[in-house]
């Protein structure tokens, strides 16, 4: 999972530019969530975050929960 996020950050993100509506960015959120909560819970938190990141959601701070 972490390698997938790293690949996205290194190769895909520079091509499409900044698009995340939240702070921290979705990729940073994913890294932190997986590091803090492990691959299952952290991965699930990341998927939920990605589903919230769309033009109809207000922008703002959305930290990884404890």
From Swiss-Prot:
Keyword field contains Transport: no
GO CC terms, sorted: plasma membrane
Subcellular location per the Swiss-Prot or TrEMBL entry: Cell inner membrane
Pfam families assigned: YidD
Entry keyword Cell membrane: yes
Keywords (A to Z) from UniProt: Cell inner membrane, Cell membrane, Membrane
Topological category with respect to the lipid bilayer: Peripheral membrane protein
Assigned protein family: Belongs to the UPF0161 family.
Protein function: Could be involved in insertion of integral membrane proteins into the membrane.
Name assigned to this protein: Putative membrane protein insertion efficiency factor
Organism field: Parasynechococcus marenigrum (strain WH8102)
